[in-house]
Amino acid sequence: VDRLLKSPAKQRGRDFGVILACFRDEGYTVEWRVINAAEYGYQQRRRRIFIFGYKNDTKYAKDVLKKAEYDDAFENAEKACKMEKVILKDGFFAKTFPVNKAENAKKVMKELPIEVGEVSEKFNCSFENSGIMKDGTIYTLKTIPYYHGKQITLGDVMETGRVDEQYFIPEEKLYYTNPDITHSNEIENKLPKESRQTWQYLKGAKKLLRTSANGHEYVFSEGAISMIDQEDKPARTMLTSEGGFSRTTHIVKDKETGKIRLLTATETERIQGFPTDHTKYCLVKGETV
C-alpha cells in the first residue's frame, strides 16, 4: 500500500529505502508510482504503490535511458532533469498511466548509503508518489494523473433488477435515533447495546472511554463517514470485511425498491474488475459446479 513510502513514522522512508538499496545491489533500476484506479476511470478508489524494476544491462533499460538522454557522467542537476523525463514521459508507467508534474511540485534527489545496514539505521527520505532510482541515486517528485476519459461509478456496477432479500438491512439495524444525527458522545453515558449495533452508530463520529493494556484510560474518537455510499462516485476501497458489520462496508440504496442494502456478490465482483458471475461456477475434478 502507498504508506510504504512513509513508514516507519519515526524514520520516514526507511523501509522503502531498504527495498531500493537491495534492488540497487542486484543491478536494477527501479521506477515507482502510487496509482489510484479511480483517477484513471475505474470503478474503485483503490490506491496502491506499484514498483517496476529492470536490470541495468537489459535492452529495455538501455532504451529507456537513451530516450531520456540520460548519462551516468552527468552532474546531479542534469541527472535530475533526465530522471524527471523518465518519470513523466519515457518510463514504464508514463505511457499507460500518464501524469503531469504537480503545481509547485516538491522534488527530492538523494543518494542511498552504500551499505543496506546503514540505510536501515540512518536513512530517511520524503518519497513522493512518483520516482526512480538508478545506481543508488533517488529522484522523486509529486505528479497528478492526466486522464479525461469515461469515469465508471458505483451506480454503473449496481444491479438494476430484483435483489435477494438477504442483502436488505432492517430499519431497526439502520438507525437508533434521528437519521440526521451523525455523532455520539459516550464519555459520560454509554449507549445501550442495541444502539451500538446499528449502522448509524458504526459509521457515525464517536467519543468513548477506553483503557489501554497498562491500565491507562483515554478518550478514543473517530470522525463520521458517509452512511449511504454515493452512486455517482467510484466505490471506496473494498476490504476483506465487505458485507460484514464493519465501518468500511458499503451500504447502497437499491435501484428498484429504494431500500437500503448491502452490496451483492455480483456487485463486489464488478467493483474488483471481475466479469459478472465470475465466482458462480468453479472446476472441481474437471467438472463445472
Would you name each region that the model predicts?
Residues 1-54:
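Conserved Class I SAM-dependent methyltransferase catalytic core
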Residues 3, 58-59, 245:
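Glycine-rich nucleotide phosphate-binding loop and flanking beta-alpha elements
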Residues 6-9, 62-63, 249-250:
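Short glycine-/acidic-enriched loop or helix-start segments at secondary-structure transitions
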Residues 11, 59-75, 79-80, 255-259, ...:
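Intrinsically disordered, low-complexity coil segments
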Residues 22, 80, 126, 190, ...:
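Residues that form generic nucleotide/phosphate-binding pockets
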Residues 42-144, 151:
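Flexible, glycine-/basic-rich loop-and-beta segments that form/coincide
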Residues 130-289:
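C-terminal target-recognition/interaction regions appended to catalytic cores
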